[in-house]
């Protein structure tokens, strides 16, 4: 019975931190709320934007059919979350139950969900990767840079 009490206390008063504020992190946070979690929910994401849909970046956005700012993911429900966007999680202290952030602050948690996704594989030759006209397309900022370059026309 003590376990049931501690789970109920976590559900009501606990602190859950989600590292990764993209599709997986958003859907996990929504599910927590749908399943009755009423405690503190903190979303941490290294990009300064709320969760957005990535596939349109390489399709509709590049074709000019959809502006970058219209790729925000729809919400299934209100999250009542504390958003820490534009600041990367840099370290995890599991003993202290604390996530360190790039801005020097930290966030304490009772439960932690890591949903950071993946990154594009870097170009194998760093010198070539830095050449003018070489692009990676993963984020809204990447898409905006590429759209601007395409609009400028050939060089």
Language model features by range: what are they?
Residues 1-13, 79-155:
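FAD-binding core/adjacent interface of flavoenzyme oxidoreductases
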Residues 5-83:
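Beta1-alpha1 glycine-rich phosphate/pyrophosphate-binding loop at the start
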């Amino acid at each position: 019975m003590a376990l049931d009490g501690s789970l109920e206390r976590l559900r009501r008063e606990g602190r859950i931190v989600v590292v990764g504020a993209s599709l997986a992190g958003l859907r996990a946070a929504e599910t927590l709320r749908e399943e009755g979690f009423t405690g503190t929910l903190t979303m941490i994401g290294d990009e300064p934007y709320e969760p957005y849909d990535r596939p349109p970046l390489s399709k509709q956005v590049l074709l000019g059919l959809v502006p970058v700012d219209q790729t925000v993911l729809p919400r299934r429900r209100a999250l009542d979350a504390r958003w820490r966007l534009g600041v990367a999680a840099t370290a995890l202290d599991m003993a202290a139950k604390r996530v360190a952030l790039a801005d020097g602050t930290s966030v304490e948690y009772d439960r932690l969900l890591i949903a950071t996704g993946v990154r594009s594989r870097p170009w194998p030759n760093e010198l070539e990767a830095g050449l003018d006209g070489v692009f990676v397309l993963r984020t809204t900022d990447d898409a905006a840079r590429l759209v601007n370059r395409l609009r400028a026309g050939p060089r």
